[in-house]
Amino acid sequence: MTMPCSFKEHGCTETIPFTEKLAHEESCLHAPCHCPIAGSRPYRGRSLRDHINMEHATIQYTRVTASSLSPLSMRNDEPARLVSLGSRAVFLLVVDRSIPSGRALSVIHLVSDPIEKEDFKYKIEVHTRIGILSVSGSKTPSVGRLTTTYQAGASLLVSDIVWSPQDSPVYLELK
C-alpha cells in the first residue's frame, strides 16, 4: 500500500510505501521547518544553519575559544547570537522572550549534516544585579532542521527585574 507524502501541498511529489512514510517525512525537504529565533515563520528545504545565514543576516557572530568562559556583550533586544568554536562548530544562543517578565537563554549546536553531530558541554552564565546565574549541560543538542517547534531541553531563566544589558553580561563556555 502506498500513499502520498503529507507535505504534498508544500511541493513533495513522492508516493511512498506506508511502512516508510514516517522515515520519509522526517527527512522530506518539503516539510515545513521551524526556527527558534523569535518572530520567525516556518520555512522549508534548507538546514537551520543555512536558513539563519540567509534569513537572519543581522544575527551577530562571536568567535570563542574552547573551555574558556567568553563574554558575548549582548544587546537587550538581541533575539539570538551565533557562536563559533574556532572552525570546529557553530552554535546558536537562543533568547526566548516569551517568558512573562523575563527571558530564557539556551544553546543548540547547528549542524548541516548528521555526521557533524558531536557532544559539546556548555555553560551559560549571566551576571545580574543580584549575583551570577548559570546553567550548564553535558550535551548540547545538535540540530540540522527543526520539524517541530523548538523546545529547549535546559535554559537559564533571567527575570527582567535583575537583567540590565549594561550590567548583565552574558558569558558562554563550550567544550
Feature locations, PLM:
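Signature of small Cys/His-rich zinc-finger-like modules used by ubiquitin/SUMO E3 ligases
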Residues: 1-175
